[in-house]
Amino acid sequence: AAYLKHVKGLADTTISVEIKSLKHIVKKAFNDGQMEKNPFAYYYYFADQPEIEYLTEEEINKLIIGKVKQQRQDRTRDMFLFCCFTGLSYADLAKLSYEELKQTPNGAWWISSIRQKTKVPFTVKLLPVAKAILEKYRIPANRFNRLFPENPGKVFPVASLKSSGVCLKHIARQCGITKNLKFHMARHTFATTLSLMNGIPLETVSKMLGHKYTTTTQIYAKVTNQMIDNAISRIEDQIG
């Protein structure tokens, strides 16, 4: 692990995957009698949990009501907010088609799709902000702009991730947000501020995000612990 980290410069999560694969190969060789001992029998590698970056409710509201100067910034903000309120990754946003939008008899809209990264199916209901953005881009006049590809057959006119990243920096400054906005933060914001902090169980969040394993969603466990701590603090304040 030290070699992979300090010599090869791999990230903790990558090291964890590499070691898991190596342990599997060595264990099979040992079980097949090709090795006298399994050197990895009692070896475990625990990767450091990455720090999760997400927006608070206050920052989300600043983003919604803030004024931006350019049309492309307005579109990029819409795309970012849609991801905040659905948990979609940038890749899944770009490939979202109308066939993946389902409306129930009571008028609610749902996204039923498959994650591009993991090929895992996921379903998520459109909250009012996401629904309003969807309706905005169903109007043909809002779909066409020389800075955004037409993206035929898709729901949104999505620009490149690099171009959107540059826009997000300007948007943050104009909306009074000090954090360095990146599109992966939108997905984290959905998981934390909009889901876990509103009492949605971790297992349900995992399904909405399209995670292949529930363990992947454990990166948000620290936020869950923070929620518990805040709840206990409120009880202590009430009791006096």
Language-model-detected regions and their locations in the chain:
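C-terminal catalytic core of Y-nucleophile DNA break-rejoin enzymes
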Residues: 116-136, 144-170
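Catalytic-site neighborhood detector that most strongly recognizes the C-terminal catalytic loop/helix
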Residues: 47, 54, 115-119, 209-234
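Basic, Lys/Arg- and aromatic-enriched nucleic-acid-binding interface segment
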Residues: 10-18, 31-90, 94, 198
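C-terminal catalytic core of tyrosine-transesterase DNA break-rejoin enzymes
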Residues: 81, 85, 91-92, 170, ...
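Short, polar N-cap/turn motifs at the start of nucleic acid-interacting alpha helices
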Residues: 100-107, 178-179, 199-219, 230
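Conserved tyrosine-mediated DNA breakage-rejoining catalytic core shared by Y-recombinases
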Residues: 44-53, 57-59, 95-136
